[in-house]
Amino acid sequence: MKTNQSWGGRFAEGPKEAVAQYTDSQSYDRALYAQDIRASQAHARMLGRQGVITPEEAQLLVEGLDRVREEIRSDSFIWKPELEDVHMNIEARLTEIMGNVGKKLHTGRSRNDQVGLSFRLFVADRLETWRQRAAALCAILVQRATEHAGDILPGCTHLQPAQPVSLAHHLLAYAWMFRRDAMRLGDCLDRVRISPLGAAALAGTTYPLDPQSVAKDVGFDGIYGNSMDAVSDRDFVLEALFGGSTIMMHLSRLCEEIILWANPAFGFVRLPDSYSTGSSIMPQKKNPDVAELMRGKTGRVYGSLMGMLTIMKGLPLAYNRDMQEDKEGFLDADRTVEASLRLMAGMMEEIAFRTDRMREACKAGFLNATELADYLVGKGLPFREAHHVTGQCVAAAEKQAKGLEDLTLPEMQALEPRIGEDVYAILDYAAAVQRRETPGGTGPQSVAAQVAQLRTWLAGMDGMVQ
């Protein structure tokens, strides 16, 4: 059977059906249709300006591609698996519409640089959405923090009670994480927005192309420095997937805390019904399924990153068909990251914090022990000695099943005579939070400064996704 592939001139027969199915990518890379058309229109305009084709032909190609775009948007476009991918499907339909003029679109271009530009455009568009969603989640966390500036809860290390902190401070820790995530994606975009068009298959082209004008036309910052590098690397995908993996890691950590806090043993939050599910057998259950699934889906995004690293690790220069596998993993990661950020923003907006339970929990675990040690330092003890005396006080309180603040003054003075009546004000949990005003600390002025910093940054994030 004679092949009708674009590359079929030197072949006597086409690929077997099983081979065609195995190599087909149009079933998923059609997601790139808008970016492919955008890149092809920029290429056509450049060909017209450079005299490679006439300006009239360039305009016809642009108009024909507009028509193809509308057909795809309206679901009237007929996808043909035998044409392998989105790029050849679009070009074939353009040729059906425009005749021989359509066949001129690919002049001076290889699928290698064509695919590279289309995918870079797609990744850039998606990263911008991730960036805006991360910023939107950051904004919600900042807002919830301002609502709880005066509420305290146990801060933990090793998941053990450590020191009291404000709920605002705890929430802002995640706000800073998602701010960094958004900034990291912005840095990544600087390297994604590099156009490979003009590199052709690997060695450049003899046509008098103007790659810089194509880059400018599609909104990119510049062009490749080496044509072989331009078509043979996918480090921009790796970097994007790392950014997505880091977002998911931060989301997963927040999910873990939500899951713990929703457990009645903690009882720190009430989950919205709309972000919970029940049990088919236990009527009382209210399960944090959204948080659990988000924690689980983190592994999917990690898998996409590891898969892409593995695909690229042994490829010689320049382009190899292995690189077709770059898209499915990214497409899956894109759906997961975008949906997770959107759902977490909604959940954090509606979640109810049980601040009474948080405050009560501060009384367990001797969270004010560091306050006593610092108090003793103020009384003239070296810190290591103060640390030892405080440990003795903790042991004495623990033996009586009460808090440090419940020890009598004589009980404490028996361990260290310099302890005075003023120690009880020091041992107050809320006061302990208020005293920590170092930069980035949990004190109210420090928290207010953090809020101001984050809001200043958010104000520069134009067009945040809601």
UniProtKB/Swiss-Prot annotation:
Keywords: Amino-acid biosynthesis, Arginine biosynthesis, Cytoplasm, Lyase
Domain of life: Bacteria
Principal location class: cytoplasm
Pathway: Amino-acid biosynthesis; L-arginine biosynthesis; L-arginine from L-ornithine and carbamoyl phosphate: step 3/3
Record's subcellular location: Cytoplasm
GO molecular function term, any single one: argininosuccinate lyase activity
InterPro entries reported in the protein's UniProt record: Arg_succ_lyase_C, Argininosuccinate_lyase, Fumarase/histidase_N, Fumarate_lyase_CS, Fumarate_lyase_fam, Fumarate_lyase_N, L-Aspartase-like
Cross-referenced SUPFAM superfamilies: L-aspartase-like (SSF48557)
UniProt EC number: 4.3.2.1
GO biological process: arginine biosynthetic process via ornithine; L-arginine biosynthetic process
Reactions catalysed according to its record: 2-(N(omega)-L-arginino)succinate = fumarate + L-arginine
Family: Belongs to the lyase 1 family. Argininosuccinate lyase subfamily.
Descriptive protein name: Argininosuccinate lyase
